Amino acid sequence: MVTLEQFRYCPTHSTHPPFCYDFHYVKPGMVAIFGDNGSGKSTLAQLMAGWYPDFLPGEITGTGTLLGTPIGRLPLNEQSATIQLVQQSPYLQLSGCTFSVEEEVAFGPENLCLAEKEIMARIDAALALTECQPLRHRHPATLSGGETQRVVIACAIAMQPKLLILDEAFSRLTPQAREMLLQRLQHWALERGSLIILFERHHTPFLNHCQQAW
């Protein structure tokens, strides 16, 4: 599903030597990439999410493919339907144009022009997986940090991506909520044939839920 071979990304106007990435994983499930702050985790997550070149201008060398397509070649409409990235700050990922959690989770699937019945089914499944049903009619602006983080993950799940990238996406959750979500996401990935890549600083508790780690 994701392959990087001697892959380097050099941002526009960068004065630092680029990181070199080697990564290959093609099976469904959950894997993790660990690294300290400043190690290039978030940049790698954004590259795997297909942000180059539209949102990550610069130059790339080496080989990189996402779901069989070279990095930078996947059309935006296909990319949004197959790859989702959830980052550490949930508030920055809300659309800002909805009045309830239900509308927020529906926003992505509606932009795929799906049938209303399919959209509602995706909303129900995503809210159930993330334990967000009680938040369904709440305004996104009234949510706590942990609640917002679960809603943003629900939005990504509702898109039913083949590749889901979670970049420190559990930072505001309680240990109990984090453990619940990790278990459910692992099961979801295996059931749907999708790949989840976690980007985290600390091994615990994420390593216990992953098939492989780097």
Residue ranges and their predicted role:
Residues 139-143, 147:
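Conserved ABC ATPase signature
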Residues 89, 97-111:
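Q-loop/switch helix immediately C-terminal to the Walker
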Residues 160:
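Conserved catalytic motifs of ABC-family nucleotide-binding domains
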Residues 106, 117-135:
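Conserved ABC ATPase "signature" region
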Residues 164-168:
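Catalytic Walker B motif of ABC-type/P-loop ATPase nucleotide-binding domains
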Residues 153:
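Hydrophobic anchor residue at the start of the ABC signature
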Residues 57-59, 69-84, 111:
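ABC ATPase NBD coupling module
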